């Protein structure tokens, strides 16, 4: 199975992978060569989501997609509270190319206010969080509508995380098995 590379200009998205630089909850880059990949089925859903967002004058910003199993181990080993990090022995939807972390950008390229950043690994990051303002909750619901209308499932603990239904039907992939050369 080959993954599909998601990169402008072929894809009308902004790609800024959080684990490609030090501005993330780990405080260091995880990917030596950050590139964005998805399973072909997830790429099809993403294409629909891009269209739904564009119809509303918005764009998607991708902050993570395929995450090689080596990277999943790095996150797991760094995180004392494992509530928000999938056990790499079972595999994450990201490690199957089946998940994408996204937010919305307005026509000026600024992120819509979601009431917390991507990777807000606290209850504030949950879809049902009560701390965001009504406007911030409306932005989260707008993203939820765009992504689910495109065919993605959502994850209750992360407003930014969308994945294929039944992602465990797909294999966990290492960087080498996927042929992505992200880890170095």
Language-model regions: role of each:
Residues 1-65, 75-157, 165-184:
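Extracytoplasmic cell-surface/polysaccharide-interacting catalytic and binding patches
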């Amino acid at each position: 199975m080959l993954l599909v590379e998601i990169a402008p200009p072929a894809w009308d998205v902004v790609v800024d992978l959080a684990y490609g630089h030090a501005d993330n909850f780990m405080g260091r880059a995880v990917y030596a060569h950050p590139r964005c990949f998805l399973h072909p089925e997830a790429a099809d859903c993403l294409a629909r989501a891009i269209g739904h967002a564009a119809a509303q004058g918005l764009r998607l910003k991708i902050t993570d997609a395929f995450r090689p199993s080596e990277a999943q181990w790095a996150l797991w080993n760094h995180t004392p509270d494992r509530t928000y990090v999938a056990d790499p022995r079972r595999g994450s939807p990201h490690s199957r190319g089946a998940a994408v972390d996204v937010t919305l950008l307005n026509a000026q390229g600024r992120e819509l206010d979601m009431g917390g950043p991507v990777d807000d690994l606290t209850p504030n990051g949950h879809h049902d969080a009560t701390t965001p303002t009504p406007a911030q909750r409306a932005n989260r619901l707008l993203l939820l509508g765009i992504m689910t209308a495109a065919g993605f499932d959502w994850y209750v603990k992360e407003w930014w995380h969308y994945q294929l239904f039944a992602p465990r039907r797909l294999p966990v992939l290492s960087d080498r098995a996927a042929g992505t050369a992200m880890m170095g």
